[in-house]
Amino acid sequence: MQMNKLLGTCLLCAWAWGQQANAQESIKVGDTTRNMITYAPEGLPYNPPLVISLHGLNQDANYQKGQANWEAVADTAKFVVVYPNGVNKAWDISGDTDIKFLETIIDTMYNRYHIDRNRVYLSGFSMGGMMTYHAMARMSDKIAAFGPVSGIPVDYRNPSGGRAVPVIHTHGTADNVVYYNGDANHPDGGYGSIPDYVKKWAAFDGCNMTPE
């Protein structure tokens, strides 16, 4: 009888866990409650990778989830995906607020799924791409590789970890918000071209400056 109760409890817990594989949830970051969407595919192995995907300005986690659709890859490659929500649909791209949020996400996913801390990846669109660059400078010791999309570094600094940082930057040449060729007259002080930023990272990483 006790064994049947135990088995029933285990089955119930497993069912409940499965229902939360694609869940909106809240976590505490210091004294603040932050929100995110977490996706964990069935059959997740021990020590899986983690992908964190950041939305753009005036967007949210639901929108980013629909656009990025990491689940289509996660289902076969077996990794965890987190879509965080920025405060007021924006990111702190120069301070510590969202750096702490990202660190807490990584710790939470480690405690829950025992994710591989050496295979944590960060990507983001537009302002989320800017936050990705900010994280490259501040927490390259905690994130293995970065994939900014249509974003720029607002405060260019070399990574804190002192290592070559794998990065793939995706940007449309016809982008009419964050211009591919830069904008010297931008109200916030102007910014350079995307190729110039990429060359800086390539130089830091010790890459051959002539593309193969």
Language model regions located:
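Alpha/beta-hydrolase active-site loop
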Residues: S94-H114
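Active-site-adjacent alpha-helix of alpha/beta-hydrolase-fold enzymes
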Residues: T173-E212
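Structural cue for short, hydrophobic secondary-structure segments
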Residues: S53-G56, Y83
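A domain-start/cap signature at the N-terminus of enzymes
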Residues: Q19-L50, N62, V73-T76, V80, ...
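Short beta-strand/loop motif that positions the catalytic acidic residue
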Residues: H169-H171
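Serine-hydrolase catalytic-loop signature spanning alpha/beta hydrolases and amidase-signature enzymes
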Residues: N58-D60
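Conserved alpha/beta-hydrolase
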Residues: K78-N88
